[in-house]
Design a protein with these regions (language model features):
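GST-like domain detector, emphasizing the conserved glutathione-binding G-site
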Residues: 2-196
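Short amphipathic alpha-helical interaction elements and helix-loop-helix interfaces
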Residues: 93, 118, 236-239, 300
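GST-like fold's C-terminal all-alpha helical module
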Residues: 164-280
Length: 303
C-alpha cells in the first residue's frame, strides 16, 4: 500500500441525506491504510488496550503481525515502514507493536508511545507528522538532512508517481486478493460481510485517489510513470551509498526504502500476482542494492 499527508469529521443526523462517498469517508477500521491519505482528522481514540502501563522502552505502533512485532520485522505498510526505518537510522531503541488506525489516538498509523518509567506520569503519543522532530530531540546522533535544492522535486516522485502505482498494484490489480486481502482485510473481522464491505471500500478509496490526477485509470500509464521515477531515483543515487551523498541515511532514504523493500519482498502477503511494478524496480540494480544495504544494516535481527 499505510504516508501524509486537515478537516474535522462531522457527525451527521441519520435523517440527513448522506454526503457522496469519497476517499475521506471510509470506515474507521480502514481509514488511512494508504500512505499519506485520507487527509482527515478523526476524533482522538483511547490508547490500545494492550498498551503497557509501565514502560521503559519506546513503542512504535505500526501495521504488522504479532510475530513481526516481536521480531521487529519491517512493517508491511509504506507509511509505517518509513518511520520505522528512520528511527533505526536515528539509533533510537524502540519496540514495535501491532495496531490499526482505529486504535491510533490520531486515527492513523504509525504513532510512538514514548517510554515512561514513572507510572504516575502520563506520556503523550507522538503522531507520524511529529516523529521526525521527536527523533531529532531524542537521538544521541540526530540526523542532519542534506540542504539540497533538488530534494522536494525528487521527493514528489515518491509522493505522486510511485505512490499512485503502488495504490493501483496493491488495491486494484490482481494483487488485491494476494496482498491487500490477507494483510488489510482478513485480519479485521471474521464476518464475511464485513470483509466484503472493507474490500469494496478499499478499492473505491484507491480509485478515487487515482481519479484526482486523471479522468481514466490506465495501468500502463501508472506503471510507465513509476518506471521513469525509479530511473530518476537511481540516477540521483548514482554510486553513492546514501541519497544526496549523505554520510548516513536520512528521511529520504527511509521514504525510498518504504516502497523498495515492500516491492522486493517476495513473501509479502501471499505473494505477487501482478509483478509489473516489482519488475520495474528489480531492473534498477542500484536501488535494489540500496534496499539490501538498509535491510542488512538496520533490520538484520528481523531477517
Amino acid at each position: 500500500m499505510s504516508s501524509s499527508h486537515e478537516a474535522n469529521a462531522t457527525v451527521r443526523s441519520s435523517k440527513q441525506q448522506p454526503p457522496p462517498r469519497s476517499l475521506f469517508s471510509v470506515p474507521a477500521p480502514i481509514k488511512q491504510l494508504f500512505d499519506q491519505f485520507p487527509l482527515l482528522t478523526y476524533p482522538v481514540n483511547d490508547l490500545p488496550q494492550r498498551a503497557p502501563q509501565h514502560r521503559n522502552a519506546h513503542v512504535l505502533y505500526v501495521f504488522t503481525t504479532d510475530k513481526g512485532a516481536i521480531g521487529g520485522a519491517p512493517s508491511y505498510n509504506p507509511a509505517c515502514l518509513k518511520w520505522q526505518a528512520y528511527l533505526k537510522f536515528s539509533k533510537i531503541p524502540f519496540q514495535t507493536a501491532s495496531a490499526n488506525n482505529h486504535a491510533s489516538p490520531s486515527g492513523s498509523l504509525p504513532f510512538m508511545l514514548p517510554a515512561s518509567p514513572d507510572p504516575y506520569k502520563e506520556t503523550q503519543p507522538v503522531p507520524s507528522g511529529k516523529l521526525q522532530r521527536w527523533a531529532l530531540n531524542n537521538s544521541e546522533s540526530p540526523i542532519e538532512e542534506p540542504g539540497d535544492s533538488r530534494y522536494e522535486a525528487y521527493h514528489s516522485l515518491l509522493d505522486h508517481r510511485i505512490r499512485r502505482a503502488w495504490l493501483y498494484t496493491i488495491y486494484l490489480s490482481q494483487n488485491s486478493t494476494t496482498i491487500a486481502e490477507p494483510l488489510y482485510i482478513l485480519p479485521t473481522s471474521r464476518n464475511s460481510f464485513v470483509r466484503l464491505t472493507i474490500s469494496r471500500e478499499l478499492r473505491l478509496a484507491a480509485e478515487q485517489e487515482l481519479l484526482k490526477y486523471s479522468s481514466i485509470i490506465n495501468d500502463e500509464t501508472l506503471y510507465n510513470q513509476a518506471d521513469e521515477a525509479f530511473a530518476a531515483l537511481e540516477t540521483l543515487l548514482g554510486k553513492d551509498k546514501w541519497f544526496f551523498g549523505a554520510e548516513t541515511p536520512g528521511v529520504f532514504d527511509a521514504s525510498v526504502f518504504a516502497y523498495t523493500h515492500l516491492l522486493l519482498e517476495a513473501r509479502l502477503g501471499k505473494g505477487w500476482a501482478d509483478t509489473r511494478l516489482r519488475d520495474a524496480l528489480m531492473a534498477r540494480k542500484r536501488l535494489v542494492t540500496h534496499r539490501d544495504r538498509i535491510l542488512a544494516e538496520y533490520f538484520a535481527e528481523a531477517a
